[in-house]
Design a protein with these regions (language model features):
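Transmembrane-helix signature of polytopic, membrane-embedded enzymes
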Residues: 104-131, 149-150, 515, 519
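Loop-to-helix entry region of an early transmembrane alpha helix in multi-pass inner-membrane enzymes
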Residues: 68-72, 80-102, 123, 138, ...
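Membrane-proximal stem/loop segments at transmembrane-domain junctions that anchor or position
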Residues: 284-466
Length: 574
């Protein structure tokens, strides 16, 4: 393929991706996620009240429930086009997501181990990214996914340049220059990783994947080489390998230190601000997006985590907490290990559903103080603030069953429910007993099932036809779920299979660099999947960041398939 034809094809695919995203952003805007309203309120408060707060009205108390990256991004756009112009935000996000497609193509170009297939790989990866509906839909929302995907690909590309410079065989004449360039790229990786974490705290897992790749990818060849040389040269006089080993180890430490230092500098202003305002060392955001002193029902969350294995239960037993009553009869059988345990859970839920009755019958319950909460906002409902368990402090859930504009007090007055510390302690005791009885189930089997439900989903969230494919009898024919959901499930399978095929191509290349990229991809996906499968809210949107990586690997696989098909065709003609 000539340069002109390749550039033309690249431009066409990029325009297709842009048109798709602009169309979705304009015609399918989605303002339902509560997180979006929280971010928008914070951005407006920064511009209008000059304070970082999630309160919709005075006194606009300072807040730390969300990291400042995305609200400041919104504020920068609002300051130009108006404080409520989310249409402009969506258009900018469409441009950024299109830029992500271009970066995906560049990353695939560098990861392809075969020089003759690099251009085809880039075009294939670009095509996969351009038409990917799973990432495109987030251009229509006021959420962090678009920027996170862009920064993820930029981080992987920076690490690719740094690792490539670091692992390339060089001469004495160019060694210092290449090392300087490599160190610069590690600083860029730290900067991009820090900004990504300011958008979504769990993005730090991608930086961890880069760091592990640096250590493993740099030291493994050294260890293997030393073992091989020891086996071959026993009894013979050979050059001492220790100076080279020391040089490599020194460079690994220096590279990691440079990346970490820049990363810490990015987080420093937010950390200092939280220390000065709240007297807390809080470099990210609180684990459950709670304000200082706010009660979090950790016992109930642990109990849910001891049995929940499917995302369909999240909307039934997590988001309604402190908003709606919870019926013990709706719980699955897996939530109980015995009839006695079910009775204990039923008694606790009875207290939760009817707090007034429990206060009259339980003297201990009468002494429980009301749950401390930050100033309520329509977009920071109790469901979204108190039920999310996330050790990386990712934003609270986007979905719940609250009506817009209702405050937390109004919800509690209407529902008459309350999760008290006493009730929560009861759930904590049951959860610990369940974990002690079946540690394998809790630590291994349930995370595997949650990982499955996150990955093998239709990933139709925020599309007009969103829903679950199974059971088929529950499909909504009015919004054509019978067509769209099977299509999206099929696309998920296609992207997954292409990703696996691309990983196989990298492994089979038997080149150090190719396997290094495979290690980076596996760690970037694996660390995140392990974390979120260990939580009690396995939402499929938490794996949307995997699709850019699958596009890169898929491009590598398509290039291999295309070349093999062409070779077979030429052989038949001959």
């Amino acid at each position: 393929m000539t340069n002109g034809r390749w550039l033309l094809a690249f431009a066409i695919f990029l325009l297709i991706g842009l048109a798709f995203r602009v169309y979705v952003a304009h015609w399918l805007p989605n303002d339902t996620p509560d997180d979006g309203r929280v971010y928008a309120q914070m951005a407006r408060n920064v511009l209008e009240q000059h304070v970082y707060s999630h309160d919709p009205e005075a006194p606009f108390n300072p807040s730390l429930i969300r990291l400042p990256g995305y609200p400041l991004f919104l504020a920068s756009i609002y300051s130009v086009v108006g404080h409520t112009n989310n249409g402009a935000v969506r258009f900018v996000q469409a441009l950024i997501d299109t830029a992500s497609c271009a970066l995906i193509a560049v990353l695939a170009f560098y990861w392809q181990p075969d020089e003759k297939k690099k251009r085809v790989t880039a075009l294939a990866a670009l095509a996969l990214a351009a038409v990917c509906p799973f990432t495109t839909i987030y251009t229509a929302t006021i959420l962090t996914e678009v920027l996170t995907n862009f920064l993820l690909v930029a981080l992987l590309l920076s690490a690719t340049f740094a690792l490539g410079k670091f692992t390339t065989e060089d001469t004495e004449k160019t060694r210092k220059q290449q090392w300087t360039r490599s160190l610069a790229w590690w600083c860029v990786a730290g900067l991009v990783g820090g900004i990504a974490v300011m958008m979504r705290p769990d993005a730090g897992l991608f930086l961890a994947a880069v760091g592990l790749t640096l250590v493993i990818g740099s030291l493994w060849p050294l260890v293997s080489g030393l073992r091989k040389k020891t086996a071959e040269d026993q009894g013979s006089k050979t050059k001492d390998p220790r100076p080279k080993a020391r040089r490599i180890i020194t460079r690994v430490i220096a590279s990691g230190a440079a990346m970490s230092l820049v990363f810490i500098l990015v987080l420093a202003p937010w950390t200092i601000r939280n220390w000065r305002v709240f007297h807390l060392f809080q470099p990210l955001a609180p684990q459950h997006a709670e304000m200082p002193g706010e009660f979090v029902p950790r016992g109930y969350l642990l109990w849910v985590r001891s049995w929940l294995d499917d995302q369909k239960y999240v909307s039934q037993f997590l988001w309604p907490l402190e908003v709606e009553p919870i019926d013990v009869d709706e719980l699955p059988d897996s939530a109980f290990d015995s009839p006695e345990e079910k009775k204990r859970v039923a008694a606790l839920l009875e207290k939760y559903n009817k707090p007034d009755d429990s206060e009259n019958s339980d003297t201990d319950g009468a002494s429980v103080e009301p749950t401390a909460r930050p100033t309520p906002t329509p977009s920071a409902s109790p469901a979204s603030q108190s039920t999310k368990s996330n050790p990386t402090a990712s934003p609270a859930p986007d979905e719940n069953n609250d009506e817009e504009g209702e405050s937390e007090e109004t919800d509690q007055e209407q529902s008459g429910v309350e999760m008290t510390p006493d009730i929560d302690a009861g759930f904590m005791q049951i959860a610990r007993e369940r974990i002690a009885r079946h540690p394998f189930r809790y630590y291994v089997w349930l995370p595997i099932k949650r990982a499955r439900t996150m990955w093998f989903d239709t990933h139709s969230q925020y599309w007009p036809f969103e829903g679950e494919l199974l059971p088929l009898d529950d499909l909504d024919y009015d919004i054509h779920q019978q067509y769209w959901l099977p299509l999206f499930a099929g696309l998920t399978a296609i992207y997954t299979l292409l990703g696996l095929a691309g990983a196989w191509v990298l492994w089979r290349a038997r080149k150090f660099e190719a396997r290094q990229w495979l290690l980076l991809a596996v760690l970037a996906i694996g660390l995140r999947l392990v974390l979120f499968s260990s939580l009690e809210n396995p939402e499929p949107r938490y794996v949307v960041e995997f699709f850019p990586i699958l596009c890169v690997l898929g491009g590598i696989a398509i290039a291999r398939i295309a070349v093999s098909t062409r070779s077979d065709s030429d052989g038949v003609r001959e």
